[in-house]
């Protein structure tokens, strides 16, 4: 695990974005942890969050031309990631996001920001069912662009309805890399390093044994 990944987990715990306990997911599964990126909700939080997304992008080595943030949660993520790439990596990246409802006056259309062209890096908080990615792919393809990759904050590394995770299904269906700032494996490593989180560690390991990929 890299330093920025460890720092991200500490940041998420500090902001209560990441919690350990018992949580019922939409799927009905009882999860020993929960991640709610909506709690990164101040200017300083967003600035820090962007630096972690930018670090993961730089670490990945994936080449792309435009950052795309799907409405609504992806919008601030794309914005802060673009700022962090400029400020900390000297990379001036165009960014773009979509409107949920197309506008029929002013500049019109359903895209705001840069033109959606070339190789697109989609940024979002998590992938649960892959629905948002599929909707975004329709927009990307309609503009004649290609999906270079997808970056999310956390990869839960758990099966969906079949044997694959939602992320693996996206990788299979769209032939692109899906990367994350951290994964379930990183959370386990973090808990092991802490040494005083045996209760949470056992619960997370048991969950991975049941649902992990």
UniProtKB/Swiss-Prot annotation:
| Similarity-based family | Belongs to the purine/pyrimidine phosphoribosyltransferase family. PyrE subfamily.
Protein name per the record? Orotate phosphoribosyltransferase
Q: Show which residues constitute the signal peptide.
A: none
Record's catalysed reaction(s): orotidine 5'-phosphate + diphosphate = orotate + 5-phospho-alpha-D-ribose 1-diphosphate
UniProt-recorded Gene Ontology molecular function terms: magnesium ion binding; orotate phosphoribosyltransferase activity
Q: What does this protein do?
A: Catalyzes the transfer of a ribosyl phosphate group from 5-phosphoribose 1-diphosphate to orotate, leading to the formation of orotidine monophosphate (OMP).
Cofactors (names): Mg(2+)
Which organism does this sequence originate in? Vibrio vulnificus (strain CMCP6)
Query: EC number(s) in its UniProt entry?
Result: 2.4.2.10
**GO annotations under biological process?**
'de novo' pyrimidine nucleobase biosynthetic process; 'de novo' UMP biosynthetic process; pyrimidine ribonucleoside biosynthetic process
UniProt entry keywords in alphabetical sequence = Glycosyltransferase, Magnesium, Pyrimidine biosynthesis, Transferase
Question: What InterPro entries does this protein's entry cite?
Answer: OPRT, Or_phspho_trans_dom, PRibTrfase_dom, PRTase-like
Coding gene? Answer: pyrE
Question: Do you know which NCBIfam families this protein is assigned to?
Answer: pyrE
Q: Which GO terms describe its cellular component?
A: cytoplasm
């Amino acid at each position: 695990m890299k330093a920025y990944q460890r720092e991200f987990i500490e940041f998420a715990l500090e902001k209560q974005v990441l919690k350990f306990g018992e949580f019922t997911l939409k799927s009905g599964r009882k999860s020993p942890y929960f991640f709610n990126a909506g709690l990164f909700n101040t200017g300083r939080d967003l600035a820090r969050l962007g630096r972690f997304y930018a670090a993961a992008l730089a670490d990945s080595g994936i080449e792309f031309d435009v950052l795309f943030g799907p409405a609504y949660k992806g919008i601030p993520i794309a914005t802060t990631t673009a700022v962090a790439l400029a400020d900390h990596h000297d990379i001036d990246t165009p960014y773009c996001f979509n409107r949920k409802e197309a506008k029929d006056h002013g500049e019109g259309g359903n895209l705001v920001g840069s033109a959606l062209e070339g190789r697109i890096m989609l940024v979002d908080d998590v992938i649960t069912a892959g629905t948002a990615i599929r909707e975004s792919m329709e927009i990307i393809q309609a503009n004649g662009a290609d999906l270079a990759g997808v970056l999310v904050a956390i990869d839960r590394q758990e099966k969906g309805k079949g044997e694959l995770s939602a992320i693996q299904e996206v990788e299979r269906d769209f032939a692109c890399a899906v990367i994350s700032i951290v994964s379930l494996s990183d959370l386990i490593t973090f808990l092991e390093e802490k040494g005083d989180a045996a209760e949470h560690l056992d619960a997370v390991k048991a969950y991975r044994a049941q649902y992990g990929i």
